[in-house]
A protein has these predicted regions:
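GHKL (Bergerat-fold) ATPase N-terminal catalytic module, capturing the glycine-rich phosphate-binding loop
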Residues: 1-174, 178-179, 187
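GHKL/Bergerat-fold ATPase module in large chromosome/replication-associated machines
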Residues: 112, 130-153, 174-176, 183-243
Length: 243
């Protein structure tokens, strides 16, 4: 087990993230899904260059809700992270001149995100605790967990995890429970993630049966990974023009 403090100036960073960084809390989902897609795209690149020789079957990002546990989870089967990766990209945030920068750009969320790569930390806007469970594509590397309650302190442990990739588990704040509603999450995914190049899955498709909607066995894929502008006109169907 490893415990420690994140970076050197995060005592100043977290209140900004929690209260001021984003005027619209829904942005967190876009940021986390974007990171998950990036992890999958990086795996494809490693495969193309011969650095990864494993399977590329069924690459996807999955969003799941557990109302009873109060959690929202974003899962990808991309490159994953080693313990060193987590320490480098999550714990050791190198904020050169962070205080001065935040003072200058505290009203401009996009500038801060672009400058520091703070996308992951947007999770704390809606969460009282965030967990990472991840396993690298690199053979022999143990899976690790990372847990933080929004303070600068974190805890890391080796864990058992069979599959490659990363789970980001958000323990949703009591005053942010709207993000445990599937209809709300699906609407946000369609708004921000409709044209991403990796399947984004939110639960199962539903059908009307015996007076109510029930889940089918088919994944509810939010996005279109082959948009019409990438197709030849001769290959388009009537419904393509409608959708």
């Amino acid at each position: 087990m490893q415990k420690g403090n994140i970076g050197v100036t995060t005592e100043n960073i977290f209140p900004v993230i929690k209260k001021f960084l984003y005027s619209d809390h829904e942005i967190f989902l876009r940021e986390l899904v974007s990171n998950a897609v990036d992890a999958i795209q990086k795996l494809k690149t490693l495969s193309a260059t011969g650095e990864y020789n494993g399977s590329l079957d069924d690459l996807k990002v999955t969003i799941s809700i557990d109302k009873e546990a109060g959690t929202l989870t974003v899962t990808d089967n991309g490159i994953g992270m080693t313990a060193d990766d987590v320490d480098k990209y999550i714990n050791q945030i190198a904020f050169s001149g962070a205080e001065e920068f935040l003072a200058k750009y505290k009203d401009n969320a996009n500038a801060i995100i672009g400058h520091f790569g703070l996308g992951f930390y947007s999770a704390f806007m809606v969460s009282k605790k965030v967990e990472i469970r991840t396993k690298s594509y690199i053979d022999g590397q143990p899976a690790v967990s990372w847990v933080c309650d929004g303070s600068p302190e974190y805890e890391m442990n080796e864990i058992e995890k069979e599959s490659r990739g990363t789970d980001i588990i958000l323990h949703i704040d009591d005053d942010e429970k709207e993000f445990l509603e599937k209809s709300r999450i699906d609407a946000l995914l369609k708004k921000h993630c409709k044209f991403l190049p990796v399947p984004i899955i939110s639960g199962k498709e539903q059908e009307w049966k015996d007076g109510k909607y029930v889940d089918t066995d088919k994944d509810n894929v939010i996005n279109n990974v082959e948009p019409i502008w990438g197709k030849k006109p001769a290959d388009l169907k009537d419904e393509d023009y409608i959708n």
